[in-house]
Amino acid sequence: MNALTGVLSDLDRVLLSAEDIHARVADMAKQIERDYAGRLITVVALMDGALFFVADLLRQIDLPIRLVTLGASSYHGGTQSSGQVKLQWPAGVSFTGEHVLLLDDILDTGLTLTALHERLSAEAPATLRTGVLLNKKRPRAQDSPLDYCGFEIEDEFVIGHGMDYQGRFRNLPCIGILKP
C-alpha cells in the first residue's frame, strides 16, 4: 500500500501530476541556464511553500548557485490571502551586485512577490528575475514581475508539491484541489 494513499484521498482532483511537474521544471531549468550562462546565481527561495519546487529546479541547473531562504507569507493559515505580507529577512545578507533569482511556489495576489521584488531591488543587484511554479489567472491590483512560470492555473486553492493547507499536504507529489 502506498503511504500517500490516505492523503491523496483528501483531494477532489489532481490538477498537475508529478510527471507534469518534473517535465516543466526541467524546461524551466534549461531556460534559466541559458539566461544566466557563466554566472553565479543567487537564488532567493521563499519558504516553506517553494521548498519542493526550488529543490527540484536547482538540482537541474548546471551553474554555480548561492541559496538564500526567506520567510514570507500573506496567507497566515487560511485559503485566502490576508492582504498583509510578513517578511523574515536574513540578517547580514547582501544582494548588491549579485545576479538574483527570486523563486516562489505560486503567484496569487502578487503582494508577496511584489514586496520582495521591491525590497531586493533596493539592494542594487546586478540583475533581478523572478520565477514561480504556478501563476493564478486572476486580476491583481498591480502587475507583479515574472520572468519564469511553470504553469498557469485557474484561481483555485491548491495543495501539494510544497503547498499546504494549515501545514498539511506539502508532501503530495502532485498538485491538486482539496475536497470541500
What would you call each of these model-derived segments?
Residues 1-180:
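PRPP-associated nucleotide enzymes
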